[in-house]
From Swiss-Prot:
It comes from Nandina domestica. Belongs to the universal ribosomal protein uS7 family. InterPro entries: Ribosomal_uS7 (IPR000235), Ribosomal_uS7_bac/org-type (IPR005717), Ribosomal_uS7_CS (IPR020606), Ribosomal_uS7_dom (IPR023798), Ribosomal_uS7_dom_sf (IPR036823). Transmembrane segments: none annotated. This is Small ribosomal subunit protein uS7cz/uS7cy.
Length: 155
């Protein structure tokens, strides 16, 4: 048993312009090769495009998209007696948000289009409306958890 104490959970810092933690979480996930200024540019351009498309507050659209994509339950592979079962587990709010952001960015990277800001803005607007690849991924995860409900006692 470890003598070290449990690590304190760090609170996410907020970004300089919108003063929002979700935007900063998004920036840190979109980051590639340490180019944080480029990540900020992409996010801010995407939010500006959302403002132009929907004529509403882009932060509201972002919150709505993340709320729509956040899963309540997921499956985890658990090995029991030589066979691997997909065991459904509940997900906390922080982990759910992180998954939602990862799915949104993955779906926007797969989209055809000009640049990442355009693709991200389109995916966020679609997710806020309840469509898009990220929403499909959430529904697929929920279906998997529902199908494997019989193994829930293996937790």
């Amino acid at each position: 048993m470890s003598r070290r104490g449990t690590a304190e959970e760090k609170t996410a810092k907020s970004d300089p312009i919108y003063r929002n933690r979700l935007v900063n979480m998004l920036v840190n996930r979109i980051l590639k090769h340490g180019k944080k200024s480029l990540a900020y540019q992409i996010i801010y351009r995407a939010l500006k495009k959302i403002q132009q498309k929907t004529e509403t507050n882009p932060l509201c659209v972002l919150r709505q998209a993340i709320r729509g994509v956040t899963p309540d339950i997921a499956v985890k592979a658990r090995r029991v007696g030589g066979s691997t079962h997909q065991v459904p587990i509940e997900i906390g709010s922080t982990q759910g948000k992180a998954l939602a952001i990862r799915w949104l960015l993955g779906a926007s990277r797969k989209r055809p289009g000009r640049n990442m800001a355009f693709k991200l803005s389109s995916e966020l607007v679609d997710a806020a409306k309840g469509s898009g690849d990220a929403i499909r991924k959430k529904e697929e995860t929920h279906r998997m958890a529902e199908a494997n409900r019989a193994f829930a006692h293996f937790r």
